[in-house]
Regions:
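Structural alpha/beta core scaffold segments of enzyme domains
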Residues: 1-320
Length: 320
């Protein structure tokens, strides 16, 4: 509703959007599309109701929801002890013809966890967003950070080889200490908590890391390759609106409101502002309220409302 209203210079309280259950998307279907605006313009000029019909093949060959087309140049600066002193990323991000939905925002979102789990004092992000005649890009299997995390973690592996350090050890030397939180990373976002060394230790123990390295050594003696991947990443669970200023997004929060009512028979109705997306959000809401009121989960009914009736909301997306 916000996006549609912004295009026509109409305040949000004058736009009524009725969402429908739309299958799994993890937020990828939450943005505005060009066809939405076309429909509204057609309705305004023609004066008659307009229906947009699009099948799966049409969407797959002309709609958003495509994976990234990113071109990276990146480097790490380290001292002789394996401590990272700087991280630089130059990214050319091809968002296709229209960058529907959250395309440009996904380019900025890596700033929310730019230096990952590591205490890297300085960082640089040179971001160029381009439009081409390709299909529109949008959030897909993670809203921006996954390719960035891949680049950072590969650089950590390269550095480990050059310094003849174990991949786990170089990461351990660079983790943000657990007693340093809350911690502000170089891009300006604040982490509230974390114990990355304990998480690494748990993974190494569960995977019997030493035994894996022995197996790898024996395999190479026999002319076989056994790969072992070690990765430590952070996936931002909400949004860093400071980063979104890069692409002109407003610095608002991400509220999620709900209206709860209890009838004479002890049944609960909760009204939310988002439709089903296929990840079981309504089940979670029902379980939380059933536990809180001490009732059966079947005694809770979840209803989604239109944008004018619902409390302040954002809806599922961005790993939240």
């Amino acid at each position: 509703a916000l996006a549609r209203g912004a295009v026509f210079n109409v305040p949000p309280n004058k736009v009524r959007l009725v969402a429908q259950p739309h299958g799994g998307s993890f937020g990828g279907k939450g943005g505005a599309r060009g066809c939405d605006i076309t429909i509204l313009l057609s309705r305004k000029s023609g004066g008659r109701p307009v229906k947009w019909i699009e099948d799966r093949m049409e969407y797959l060959t002309g709609g958003a929801g495509q994976a990234w087309d990113r071109h990276y140049e990146a480097s790490l600066a380290l001292d002789k002890d394996g401590k990272v002193t700087g991280f630089r990323v130059k990214l050319l991000d091809d968002l296709g013809a229209t960058a529907e939905g959250w395309g440009a925002v996904s380019s900025a979102k890596p700033l929310a966890a730019f230096t990952g789990c590591y205490a890297i004092p300085t960082a640089q992000y040179d971001l160029t967003i381009v439009a081409t005649n390709k299909l529109p890009g949008s959030p897909y299997r993670g809203m921006g950070p996954p390719p960035h995390n891949f680049v950072l973690e590969r650089l950590m592996d390269v550095a480990a080889r050059k310094l003849e350090l174990d991949p786990g050890e170089i990461r351990r030397r660079n983790f943000i200490p657990k007693d340093a939180f809350p911690y502000t990373i170089a891009s300006g976002n604040e982490y509230d908590s974390g114990d990355y060394e304990a998480a690494l230790d748990a993974v190494l123990e569960m995977g019997d890391y030493k035994a894996l390295r022995e197996r790898q050594k024996k395999a190479r003696e026999q002319g076989r390759y056994l790969g072992i991947g070690l990765v430590n990443t952070i996936e931002p669970g909400v949004f860093d609106w400071n980063a979104y200023a890069v692409v002109g997004q407003p610095g608002t929060g991400v509220p999620e409101g709900a209206t709860v009512s209890l009838d004479l028979y002890g049944k609960v109705t909760v009204r939310v502002g988002f439709a089903l997306e296929g990840q079981g959000q309504y089940t979670v809401i029902s379980q939380v309220l059933a536990d809180y009121f001490g009732i059966e989960i079947d005694d809770v009914r979840v209803v989604h409302q239109d944008t004018l009736s619902a409390p302040p909301h954002f809806g599922p997306g961005g790993s939240r």
